[in-house]
């Protein structure tokens, strides 16, 4: 009887942990999380002027659509790698427009390198290459 209770507790704890894990994943994919917790006011303004934000179709890409892989393992790797953003937020690496501009090329190259490494997987989740000019 005692083993049944322990197994039931482990089972329900596992369900709770999985639920909390999924809530955390979902929350960290929200635009508000990215733009409120990070020094991302400059890229937010640029994004809001882009076709990914405003377009005739009314479809809007969010931060996670372009920056977070859909497959589980690459997504987990991206989440772990993004922890460096917290470190740089604490340091104030890009907390002013001047610092952002000084660091922009390095950040852009890092994103382009990821795109090359994944064969633009995140772009292809929305775009059809043969329909792009």
What role is predicted for each listed range?
Residues 1-133:
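Short sequence/structural segments immediately N-terminal
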């Amino acid at each position: 009887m005692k083993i049944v209770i322990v197994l039931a507790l482990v089972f329900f704890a596992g369900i709770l942990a999985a639920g909390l894990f999924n809530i955390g994943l979902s929350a960290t994919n929200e635009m508000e999380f990215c733009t409120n917790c990070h020094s991302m006011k400059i890229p937010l303004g640029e994004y809001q002027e882009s076709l990914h934000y405003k377009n005739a179709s009314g479809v809007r890409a969010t931060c996670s659509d372009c920056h977070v892989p859909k497959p589980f393992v690459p997504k987990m790797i991206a989440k772990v790698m993004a922890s460096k953003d917290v470190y740089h937020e604490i340091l104030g690496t890009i907390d002013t427009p001047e610092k952002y501009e000084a660091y922009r090329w390095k950040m852009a190259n890092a994103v382009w390198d990821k795109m090359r490494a994944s064969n633009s997987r995140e772009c292809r989740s929305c775009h059809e290459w043969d329909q792009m000019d």
